[in-house]
Amino acid sequence: MRVVVPFGGRDPKTRLAPFFDADERREFAVSMLRDVLDAVRAVGGDPAVVADALVTVDAPVTVDDRPLTEVVGGELDDLGGGPVAVVMADLALATPAALSRLFETDADVVAAPGLGGGTNALVVRHPEFSVDYHGASILDHRRIARDAGCSFAEVDSMRLAVDVDEPSDLVEVLVHGEGRAREWLVDAGVRLARGSGRVEAVRERR
């Protein structure tokens, strides 16, 4: 299956600025991207990165600085070669097993909702479906599929629901991560702080 992996590499993960400077944020973002590419390939997917700035990874990269909706829409214009999947580059918890569930679910459109109402991954098999990544996009994608007469299924997966944007998301990577992104955080001095309330991520400067 062709798998499009959008990547924002120009100024990534600005909400992690309390933890990391700009160079570090880019390094961390690339480590997550590489984890996603590994997971996609492990289940037989054929990943291709679409980025707003050049990035060096073990996959074909196309530079396209248009908004996400336009970029993905362009990738879906031709489904003649079979279904197309879209998997976001910041799904640091994604595993081959989670992606296999997504890819193997039988529907015209299969979506993995993100926490907060986003759409973290899609499989599209119907030419009349289009995307809209603004706001609570999972609601829009349900509606678009219904209006286009597409069957629609959702994959309820914690590993696909967590897209790493906020400092609180680093906790999930430290607890559940299995790849480069977790290793990068540990090497950067990020650790769990257990207090009387929720566990938090803190950074020890080295």
Swiss-Prot record:
InterPro entries, per the entry = CofC (IPR002835), Nucleotide-diphossugar_trans (IPR029044)
Q: In which pathway does it act?
A: Cofactor biosynthesis; coenzyme F420 biosynthesis
Among the GO biological process terms of this entry, one is:
F420-0 metabolic process
Give the GO molecular function terms: GTP binding; phospholactate guanylyltransferase activity
**Which reaction is the catalytic activity of this chain?**
(2S)-2-phospholactate + GTP + H(+) = (2S)-lactyl-2-diphospho-5'-guanosine + diphosphate
Name the EC number(s).
Answer: 2.7.7.68
Query: How does it associate, per the subunit comment?
Result: Homodimer.
Official protein name in the record? 2-phospho-L-lactate guanylyltransferase
